[in-house]
Amino acid sequence: MPGKADGAYTPRADLLAGRVVLVTGAGDGIGRAAALAYAEHGADVVLLGRTERKLEAVFDLIESRTETRPVVVPADLEHASEDAATILYHAIRREYGRLDGVLHNAGLLGPRTSIAEYPVSDWLEVMHVNVNAAFIVTRALMPLLGESDDASVVFTSSGVGRRGRAQWGAYAVSKFAVEGLMEVLADETARAGRVRVNSLNPGATRTAMRAAAYPDEDPRALPPPVDHMGLYLYLMGPDSRGITGQRFDAAAWSSPR
């Protein structure tokens, strides 16, 4: 049963004070909004993404609005590897000495075409970014997360990762895999109770990926990423302590009040 919390949730200003959170795909869209929201609620944010220019812009915004200490980590998850993830682990430990949360937001859409016509190279690329990279990064960071008293890992899902639909190819399959990864990791960490793991389906949101998937859709009819930040903050912060292995939908939430 999908997880649910009060849509009127209002996070306190210091919700994430003293915490360190990694956000992948932090350069724009939902990742950018989440990184800003986390920093504005006290977290030191590790900004990971493919385009350094975009990450630097988010870094500058965080520095202008908060007293937190963000860092920029340019990384193309199409090339995610065990060695690269180990380097990330050591960089975070060296810079902060801790890690309290990970938002796996980065993802590739891939072609909107049938399985019969889906290019194998595109399939492998989408699966690597959306599934393999999330596994590789999470695996490398588990020692840090396990040292936190209250760590949170949030995987980004999709409606087509819960019910398959034609023409969604590797993207849909990758999100089914992400849901499975979430459930397995949540079950593995439940007994110790130090790391909680959930998935979040942002739904129809005004992002570049949504525009690519639905080019004829009017983006003004969709909520901007900031409208979903109450749920992103809830899952990353201590108010969701003890909630793990759940599937959340942003459509069930309203903006923080």
Segments (PLM) and residue ranges:
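Conserved glycine-rich Rossmann-like NAD(P)H-binding loop of the short-chain dehydrogenase/reductase
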Residues: 43-57
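Residue(s) in the substrate-gating loop at a strand-loop-helix junction
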Residues: 158
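Conserved glycine-rich cofactor-binding loop
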Residues: 20, 27-29
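C-terminal helical subdomain
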Residues: 2-6, 191, 195, 199-200, ...
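Active-site-adjacent segment of SDR/Rossmann-fold oxidoreductases
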Residues: 163, 184-195
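Substrate-binding pocket helix/loop in short-chain dehydrogenase/reductase
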Residues: 88, 113-115, 122-124
